[in-house]
A protein has these predicted regions:
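Extended two-metal-dependent nuclease catalytic cores across DNA- and RNA-processing enzymes
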Residues: 1-143
């Protein structure tokens, strides 16, 4: 499952502690809409708001089958209240800021993968796509 429809699913999955590849694969296999969402990764260098909204919806589905919301921050709040605050943070979906940076990085990687057969692809700087520089060294942007 290194790649589904040409996208790096493993890269996407690393943000979801406690959620396995099998669960994610089953959810994606059952829903043609989610398959199309992931096929949309890497089409453009910039992550569209529409694609990000769909990635949020997918993330909510991973954490709660009948979430009742498509926004990760709202789902985090609902799950926290449901467990009356007695919840470990790794049982909650990532917050919106964290998920956005992860989606930016996943889109950047996928865009490179989809251009891997081009002789001389033009690849823009990763800064602004979930990475930043710190002390002259490249780093993942942290929320």
């Amino acid at each position: 499952m290194q790649s589904i429809a040409g996208i790096p699913c493993i890269y996407w999955l690393c943000a979801f502690q406690g959620r396995g590849k099998v669960l994610v694969f089953r959810i994606m296999a059952k829903d043609q809409g989610f398959q199309e969402v992931f096929q949309g990764l890497g089409r453009k260098w910039q992550l569209s708001n529409e694609l990000y909204r769909d990635l949020q919806r997918f993330t909510c589905t991973i954490y709660c089958k009948n979430a009742g919301t498509n926004e990760v921050n709202e789902l985090r709040y609902r799950l926290f209240c449901l467990k009356k605050g007695d919840v470990d943070s790794n049982q909650l979906p990532p917050c919106n800021d964290s998920l956005r940076k992860h989606a930016l990085r996943a889109n950047y990687h996928t865009t490179i993968w989809k251009r891997s057969l081009q002789l001389c692809p033009v690849i823009p700087s990763p800064f602004g796509c979930g990475w930043c520089t710190e002390d002259g060294r490249d780093r993942k942007s942290v929320v």
